[in-house]
Amino acid sequence: VSTLSGEDIERQGITTLEDFSRFVSNLNVQTTAPGQNTIVFRGVSDGGGFLVDPTAAIYLDEQAMSMTSMAPDIYPIDIARIEALSGPQSTLFGASSQTGTVRVVTNKPDMEGTEITGNMAIGVSGVSKGENGFDFDATANIPIIEDKLAARVSIFSAEDGGFIDSVAGMSVVDEYTGLGGLVSNYDPVNPHTDTVEDDINGVEWWGRRAAVKWQISDDWAATVTHNHQEIEANGFNDFDPMVGDLETVKF
């Protein structure tokens, strides 16, 4: 098991599965767009085909988060650690764990004491030849009944700056078409100006998490968790070197 603690995640500025994979041997994450990933352990993959169940799973605590054809990004706010378990994990984690599992473990409500505690973080970032970004998150731990009942709430909002430009030009569609495979996204009658834009691959994140823990007895505890996250991305992270550096033609 390879593990990164919450402190390591914050220190390294990790926000995506692809970021996390750079610190774990035998793990590769192929990202086509924010929130659309293929997890590959030891070079074994289903190929990321359409409507194909993944061979590696991602979990948030004990909840499976894998989706058909992809693994979503879980924004790492108030995280205790992220684990990468290489090799078959079907006994512990069930379906989609044939090659391995990535598990995001959150901090749980702390019932000790009677005072509300919390933290808040604000950051800014920039991308060379691209946009600026920001991130904001806040967490509060609320003891309700000492040693019996507590709640924990987190919120976040972030924006990663884009750096891929969509320009007017010619795109190769099919080398066997009568046009030689070249179709322009510029037409005097219908110029498609809506497809020409700088920094099209910017992404916005926002969401919240809430958990309530009840210590029923010395041997039994129950935790109820709500997690909501949205990702809005305007474009893919690919570009065409035949068009230009960090440029592509969309139509």
Regions found by a protein language model. Give the residues of each.
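Outer-envelope beta-barrel architecture signal
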Residues: 37, 54-56, 112-118, 147-151, ...
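Transmembrane beta-barrel wall of Gram-negative outer-membrane proteins
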Residues: 128-234
